Amino acid sequence: MKERIVNLETLDFETSQEVSLRPNLWEDFIGQEKIKSNLQISICAAKKRQESLDHMLFFGPPGLGKTSISHIIAKEMETNIKITAAPMIEKSGDLAAILTNLQAKDILFIDEIHRLSPAIEEVLYPAMEDFRLDIIIGSGPAAQTIKIDLPPFTLIGATTRAGMLSNPLRDRFGMSFRMQFYSPSELALIIKKAAVKLNQDIKEESADEIAKRSRGTPRIALRLLKRVRDFALVKNSSLMDLNITLHALNELGVNELGFDEADLAYLSLLANAQGKPVGLNTIAASMREDEGTIEDMIEPFLLANGYLERTAKGRIATPKTHALLKIPTLKSQTLF
């Protein structure tokens, strides 16, 4: 599958740009109001007790602000944050090196935490529960366990697949938050704030149009904003008006619902099955894509907006999908 403009993952060239547009304070962070409210209370209480925060887990589709909100937590707690990802922690020694370099109340953010190996999880358990690192030296009867005390710290785990977390690991998080898709009005506000940082004038209706096509995801909204800005520059326009915005979005292949070719191909596959469940492996083979990408990158938004149902036997298109694609459903055959 070719690179999608609505890809939920951060593209290589976007890393530094994302940081520059990242909110630094609660008042700058738009959306996720319930999560923000709970976190503000927890942070205030922890600071009054002069303790570290409880370990917390953020889960949900990519691009909804798990990393951004973790940076704000660190800023509010007036402490440092160490960012890593589970695939980078291959050996227990890798984790030990990270943990022993943490200071009191520091935050360790582990992205894709569901990908930690069982051996790494075993090292992490006493660190989370007792702030203790158990290191085994040697093997067999001569093996010895050395216990190293760690300063109190907060582990923030982020995952797109909460169901793949082991129960022992999940149970060790004191707080767990499901990140929700954003409303068009929230995304429009994010877009307008980002446009100010980019020194780009944008019409209200242009921000609304980009927001409508951003699949409820700030990362996609900001990406589309920057691509539309490119079109405006080429057209020698200092203002992103509705005409330029519509032209750019249509050229980028993102329709008014935020769907691209991959989404429409996926939905067509289900709709043409005429109510019969389609297995994930069949979908992956037909689209020439791996199952994980389909589950993480295509299905969440479609599922949240009622375009498919997941059953034990496979995926089924809903009447909403048939109406969108103008593919009629076959009427059930009866004897009368």
Swiss-Prot record:
Give the superkingdom in one word: Bacteria
Enzyme type, top EC level: hydrolase
Q: Which GO terms describe its cellular component?
A: cytoplasm; Holliday junction resolvase complex
Keywords (alphabetical) are:
ATP-binding, Cytoplasm, DNA damage, DNA recombination, DNA repair, DNA-binding, Hydrolase, Nucleotide-binding
The record lists the catalysed reaction(s) as:
ATP + H2O = ADP + phosphate + H(+)
Q: Where in the cell is it found?
A: Cytoplasm
Keyword Cytoplasm in annotation: yes
Q: Where is this region: Head domain (RuvB-H)?
A: 256-336
Q: Where does this chain mainly localize?
A: cytoplasm
| CDD domains, per database record | AAA
Q: Which SMART domains match?
A: AAA
Sorted alphabetically, which NCBIfam families does this protein's record hold?
Answer: PRK00080.1 (NF000868), ruvB (TIGR00635)
How does the annotation summarize its subunit structure? Answer: Homohexamer. Forms an RuvA(8)-RuvB(12)-Holliday junction (HJ) complex. HJ DNA is sandwiched between 2 RuvA tetramers; dsDNA enters through RuvA and exits via RuvB. An RuvB hexamer assembles on each DNA strand where it exits the tetramer. Each RuvB hexamer is contacted by two RuvA subunits (via domain III) on 2 adjacent RuvB subunits; this complex drives branch migration. In the full resolvosome a probable DNA-RuvA(4)-RuvB(12)-RuvC(2) complex forms which resolves the HJ.
Q: What is known of its domains?
A: Has 3 domains, the large (RuvB-L) and small ATPase (RuvB-S) domains and the C-terminal head (RuvB-H) domain. The head domain binds DNA, while the ATPase domains jointly bind ATP, ADP or are empty depending on the state of the subunit in the translocation cycle. During a single DNA translocation step the structure of each domain remains the same, but their relative positions change.
**Function statement:** The RuvA-RuvB-RuvC complex processes Holliday junction (HJ) DNA during genetic recombination and DNA repair, while the RuvA-RuvB complex plays an important role in the rescue of blocked DNA replication forks via replication fork reversal (RFR). RuvA specifically binds to HJ cruciform DNA, conferring on it an open structure. The RuvB hexamer acts as an ATP-dependent pump, pulling dsDNA into and through the RuvAB complex. RuvB forms 2 homohexamers on either side of HJ DNA bound by 1 or 2 RuvA tetramers; 4 subunits per hexamer contact DNA at a time.
Its name, as the record gives it, is Holliday junction branch migration complex subunit RuvB
**Organism (species):** Helicobacter pylori (strain G27)
Q: Source gene?
A: ruvB
